[in-house]
Design a protein with these regions (language model features):
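Sec/Tat signal peptide C-region and signal peptidase I cleavage site
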Residues: 16-20
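Extracellular beta-rich ligand/substrate-recognition surface
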Residues: 31-41, 82-91
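An acidic-aromatic loop/edge-strand motif
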Residues: 21-33, 110-149
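Short beta-strands within extracellular/lumenal beta-sheet-rich domains
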Residues: 37-49, 91-98
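Beta-strand-rich ligand-recognition modules
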Residues: 68-125
């Protein structure tokens, strides 16, 4: 019992509420399936990056409901996201170390998002599909906005 309580506390420590962060990124979605249940949406962004020497780079990522993240063809996150609630506007985000996947020069970021569109056991639907991707490092920013495909 003590071990499971410790494990639960460690898991919750890695997930943070969106309202606790000052976001520069914008929520992005697809006009075809913003509110349709069981929707899958792909997002893609190509970015040119300077040298990353000596720094650790994190991306803060929030979705309603689950996501998969690839950088330069390598899977970084498998089934991220999900926790929402207790109100529809309450969103948590994942703080992901993406340093080892990035390179100096051209980088490709792809996110596949699955929007459930309904409430679940530990999930309160926001009522709309969306992605929030915020990566701010020394010398560059990668932010979800209208430039993503």
């Amino acid at each position: 019992m003590k071990l499971s309580t410790l494990f639960m506390a460690l898991c919750l420590a890695c997930v943070t509420s969106v309202s606790a962060k000052n976001w520069e990124a914008k929520w992005i979605t697809s006009s075809e399936c913003q509110t349709r249940s069981n929707s899958w949406i792909c997002f893609h962004k190509s970015v040119e990056l300077p040298s990353l020497e000596g720094q650790t780079v994190y991306a803060d990522i929030a979705v309603d409901s689950k996501y998969w993240l690839w950088i330069n063809g390598e899977m970084v996150v498998f089934e991220g996201g999900l926790k929402r609630g207790p109100k529809p506007q309450d969103t948590y985000y994942d703080h992901v170390d993406i340093t080892k996947y990035l390179t100096q020069g051209e980088n490709s970021i792809a996110v596949l998002m699955w929007y459930f569109g309904k409430d679940g056991f530990s999930h309160k639907s926001s009522g709309k599909a969306g992605l929030l991707f915020d990566c701010q490092a020394n010398g560059f920013k990668i932010l979800s906005d209208g430039s993503w495909n």
